């Protein structure tokens, strides 16, 4: 997705464990300080959804804390869009069978086996529970001004094409309409309808020629 973007104008942020400083700061602090300046992009590989859902699944969040996190995320994203940011969130969905297949491939190679963590193994074992947790978070945080896009990620090329198309559409809309979000009124956050994971087709594939034609288009 980023290979054709001028590297001077974007950053890729991959956040895992919090630093000691970040542990003493508000939940969204480490994301806020990595926001791009005007005219630039920031791609978050994982983000506030993954952090929140993982902590909920592990039992580290009470229901009240989880609810407070949801509210904080809504306000944070609304603050961003009210200040001219284009916020686009992608959930790359694969089936349980495909997940197992990819994990097996990684585990068989000495130079990639390290990528499979205990958390990955646990998530695969509890695939349905994890999917439900992520879907619940997305339903609660998919705003009209900062929607979630659920992507069929069974095929890498098809995934890249879908993400690029959504990004292009989002940027075009943002450029034609600078006011991305409606004013904040009495904590009302319009929600967008989220499709069920079971309704997302996972059989889309592209051959090399078709992929190149679609990408060039």
Where are these regions (language model features)?
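Glycine-rich phosphate-binding loop of ATP-dependent small-molecule kinases
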Residues: 1-217
């Amino acid at each position: 997705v980023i290979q054709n973007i001028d590297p001077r104008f974007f950053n890729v942020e991959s956040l895992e464990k919090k630093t000691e400083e970040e542990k003493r700061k508000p939940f969204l602090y480490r994301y806020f300080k990595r926001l791009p300046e005007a005219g630039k992009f920031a791609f978050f590989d994982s983000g506030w959804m993954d952090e929140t859902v993982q902590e909920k699944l592990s039992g580290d969040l009470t229901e009240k804390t989880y609810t407070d996190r949801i509210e904080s995320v809504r306000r944070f994203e609304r603050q961003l869009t009210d200040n001219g940011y284009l916020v686009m969130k992608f959930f790359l969905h694969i089936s349980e069978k495909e997940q197992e297949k990819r994990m097996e491939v990684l585990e068989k190679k000495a130079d990639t086996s390290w990528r499979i963590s205990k958390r990955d193994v646990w998530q695969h074992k509890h695939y349905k529970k994890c999917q439900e947790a992520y879907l619940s978070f997305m339903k609660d945080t998919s705003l009209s001004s900062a929607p979630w896009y659920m992507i069929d990620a069974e095929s890498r090329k098809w995934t890249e094409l879908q993400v690029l198309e959504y990004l292009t559409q989002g940027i075009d809309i943002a450029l034609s309409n600078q006011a991305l979000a409606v004013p904040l009124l009495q904590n009302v956050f319009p929600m967008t309808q989220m499709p069920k994971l079971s309704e997302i087709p996972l059989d889309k594939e592209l051959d090399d020629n078709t992929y190149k034609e679609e990408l060039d288009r």
